[in-house]
Regions:
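Glycine-rich, low-complexity intrinsically disordered segments
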Residues: 1-214
Length: 214
């Protein structure tokens, strides 16, 4: 007789198969970050150096401004313009200054601090960021991407070179705040999932999300 008790380690829901087993979660430590066209050269070597020195990264945070419509005896709310909050990327500095060189190149693209001159247009310094969650593969068993946020129109909003201290055993780090124009989410096969996926858009006025059933 098979042991089926593991299917009960779940959350009871309504309908058939209410005790199906839990889904495998994505793991926070299985990830990588690529900064495409980051620095002056935008070469693959510079991108790889930065990717290898990543400590942590925050994923995109999206919010909608609130629109209030006043009415007789009441009010209703609509979703206004959206805002993508900056992500935070922490990099571990290396003794050969490879990371600092690439980061410095990118900041100099945005503003030349020696000559005190700025870029002609944003297209000359903006880059792209890819935040990918992996399946755990490595070496001969190559890693597969199961989720990717692709951020476009990126620039360094702030660079924090952090702290030095005698009482610590930790490496030196640099923290970048990266502002971006838009973010799209992809799945394992580069299919659009979540944000960016094609959804049916109603062209007729209708009342949605207001009916209560049960």
């Amino acid at each position: 007789m098979p042991i089926t008790t593991l299917t009960n380690i779940s959350i009871p829901t309504e309908g058939a198969g209410s005790n199906s087993s839990l889904l495998m979660p994505k793991l926070q430590y299985r990830f990588r970050v690529f900064l495409d066209n980051f620095g002056t050269s935008g070469a693959a070597d510079g991108t790889r150096e930065v990717s290898r020195q990543v400590v942590d990264v925050t994923r995109p945070n999206l919010s909608f401004e609130q629109m209030t419509i006043e009415a007789y005896n009441s009010r209703t709310y609509l979703a206004g313009k959206h805002t993508w909050d900056p992500i935070t990327l922490t990099l571990r500095e290396d003794a050969n200054n490879n990371v600092q060189k690439v980061v410095g190149q990118q900041i100099q693209r945005q503003f030349d601090f020696y000559e005190q001159s700025s870029a002609v247009s944003s297209g000359t310094y903006k880059f792209q960021t890819r935040i990918e969650i992996l399946d755990g593969g490595n070496g001969a068993n190559g890693a597969n991407v199961i989720d990717r946020f692709h951020l476009v129109g990126c620039y360094v909003e702030s660079a924090n070179y952090n702290t030095l201290a005698y009482a610590t055993n930790e490496p030196v780090t640099t923290t970048l705040s990266i502002r971006y124009d838009n973010a799209i989410q992809f799945g394992a096969d580069d299919d659009f999932i979540g944000i960016g996926s094609s959804e049916t858009r109603s062209t007729n006025a209708s009342v949605g999300g207001t009916a209560v059933t049960g």
